[in-house]
Amino acid sequence: MDIASPPTSKCITYWKRKVKSEYMRLRQLKRLQANMGAKALYVANFAKVQEKTQILNEEWKKLRVQPVQPMKPVSGHPFLKKCTIESIFPGFDSQDMLMRSLNTVALVPIMYSWSPLQQNFMVEDETVLCNIPYMGDEVKEEDETFIEELINNYDGKVHGEEEMIPGSVLISDAVFLELVDALNQYSDEEEDGHNDPSDGKQDDSKEDLPVTRKRKRHAIEGNKKSSKKQFPNDMIFSAIASMFPENGVPDDMKERYRELTEMSDPNALPPQCTPNIDGPNAKSVQREQSLHSFHTLFCRRCFKYDCFLHPFHATPNVYKRKNKEIKIEPEPCGTDCFLLLEGAKEYAMLHNPRSKCSGRRRRRHPVVSASCSNASASAMAETKEGDSDRDTGNDWASSSSEANSRCQTPTKQKASPAPAQLCVVEAPSEPVEWTGAEESLFRVFHGTYFNNFCSIARLLGTKTCKQVFQFAVKESLILKLPTDELMNPAQKKKRKHRLWAAHCRKIQLKKDNNSTQVYNYQPCDHPDRPCDSTCPCIMTQNFCEKFCQCSPDCQNRFPGCRCKTQCNTKQCPCYLAVRECDPDLCLTCGASEHWDCKVVSCKNCSIQRGLKKHLLLAPSDVAGWGTFIKESVQKNEFISEYCGELISQDEADRRGKVYDKYMSSFLFNLNNDFVVDATRKGNKIRFANHSVNPNCYAKVVMVNGDHRIGIFAKRAIQAGEELFFDYRYSQADALKYVGIERETDVF
């Protein structure tokens, strides 16, 4: 490719003129297309109305109109007023009727539209003002000043204000793509020698000919239909950037054009996308590549795909579960079972993950000379890979490929020595062909079933367990192994529950002294390093949760409670730490019992189970609408969760200025990072009004790593009573927003 010479001033002027003319043409074309589309819709709708009207007229002609007989006025009610009703249609006589007045109906309180939610919904910050808020028919001077300040908070960006004026234009993707394609034709003509930009007026006069323009339009359409187009010249992007500087520099525009053209290609795969494993183009890839979409889209905290509460998903836990793995059947499953091979049974039993008794240390295999077979070395690889520490829970991943896909930082790996006493596995007699899909599926299944080749063969459905075993032996020769330090962690020491309860009290007292500093929890991930002062959990005074990547015996990890009661007093470490009992950690209090929620002994798991009360919505005696409870509740009993949009503190400041102007706000501080806004989305508890003598109270509780707002009964509440809680207004705001205080009833 030849290096282009620096553009001259005439060339730059030429391209700027082309950018302006083509942009104005596209702008006019877009307007024309919009007008034509509106006209077509109007004609279609008018035709439908005409058709419906004609059908109704035909039906009315078939009906016989019968005049109503006039009613005689009742003379027995002289105190009632009479009125005469006259009809404009012929054949109907005037009628005298008694006038009856209707009683005044109380107006329904104003309610703005909102969407119901049952849990929080995280949204992105709105950097562009969606609409100018309506401040009433009479616009005051302070309203104009407020709107100007509001627009300045969004850096002057208002939705729909992209004016089509060069110099202050934000070009849309569709217009930008068409503009570059339209300008690319002039670059092709320059290369062919049909157009010289230095030719001045003579060349401009030729461009204005309609025949030439039509020919150029056909050329553009032909370029669009061609399968492979030449990438536009850099001068085109430079000219567009000079005319529309708000759209970025030439390099940004070039990258933008490349992304838009790749998106328009239907055959192009997205980045890091593996071909369909069931399709004809399936490839043989490693386990982490096959499960890439699963690890990316699946939230391990909510157990949902495309979670809307954790946009930054935590890395999957690299430790094995503590339950028993699937055992290998001691007897062969058939004539083609791998257990019939010489040395296969010893190989499988040696490599099968085995449970260990409490306090029993892992035994290391003796290192032998390098003359051992490769099969033996691979077998030792599988042994280390399959071992797990049941007592400590500090197990390595199910396979090395899974571990690499789950860890953010790659672990150091080295070869493994072979065991001294291991039989050589019989080599396959006939080569068996494996497709890419089968090889990929084997690597995925092996991370879960390990050396249970009979189960893997049944899942594959196309290979016998003997063939699966032979392929596993072949695969183990190239698998890398984790280091001995990661495979053989130190034995876990039992933590004394009383010492841990005292530690929780000390941490909680520290938080109570600085109660405003409550930060959002993010799982820590610092491999090969304990949780110290640099750990994000310790820096934010949060406990390490089960989602953290630190060691299970971390001193900052919350172990749960060992209560045998209802967990509703400060004797429970979970209740003391203002968090709900975790069903994965608290195994004795009843939080882990999922079958019958109504008979669970633990009373500290209501939010995560959604055990809310039945609430009613009705006009309030204080202001607007109010929330009423249908059933009676006891003191400190959970009523409902305050749900809404989860927004940042900066977004809450921008929205709060508009809400203060309307004198209606549903913002609720969650922690130092996020705020719950129930204005657009929420549940019925959003209508609970403020009171200095409330019957409810709000509490921010840590529930499975997430801060959530629970509304609890401050005293015993009777059925049908309206709910109030303290908004914690300042003295000035309380006088400004709360004009009526409810009458306190004595129960």
Swiss-Prot record:
Keyword Plastid part of the UniProt annotation: no
Location of cross-link Glycyl lysine isopeptide (Lys-Gly) (interchain with G-Cter in SUMO2): K327
Domain SET: 613-728
SUPFAM superfamilies given in the database record: SET domain
GO biological process: chromatin remodeling; facultative heterochromatin formation; hepatocyte homeostasis; heterochromatin formation; liver regeneration; methylation; negative regulation of transcription by RNA polymerase II; response to tetrachloromethane
Cellular compartments annotated: Nucleus
SMART domains (alphabetical): CXC (SM01114), SANT (SM00717), SET (SM00317)
Reaction catalysed by this enzyme: L-lysyl(27)-[histone H3] + 3 S-adenosyl-L-methionine = N(6),N(6),N(6)-trimethyl-L-lysyl(27)-[histone H3] + 3 S-adenosyl-L-homocysteine + 3 H(+)
GO CC field: chromosome, telomeric region; ESC/E(Z) complex; heterochromatin; nucleus
One MF term in the entry's GO annotations: histone H3K27 trimethyltransferase activity
Location of the motif Nuclear localization signal: 491-496
Biased composition (Low complexity): 369-381
PANTHER family assigned to the protein according to its UniProt record, in alphabetical order: HISTONE-LYSINE N-METHYLTRANSFERASE E(Z), HISTONE-LYSINE N-METHYLTRANSFERASE EZH1
Subunit structure comment from the entry: Component of the PRC2/EED-EZH1 complex, which includes EED, EZH1, SUZ12, RBBP4 and AEBP2. The PRC2/EED-EZH1 is less abundant than the PRC2/EED-EZH2 complex, has weak methyltransferase activity and compacts chromatin in the absence of the methyltransferase cofactor S-adenosyl-L-methionine (SAM). Interacts with EZHIP; the interaction blocks EZH1 methyltransferase activity.
Entry protein name: Histone-lysine N-methyltransferase EZH1
Species, as recorded: Mus musculus
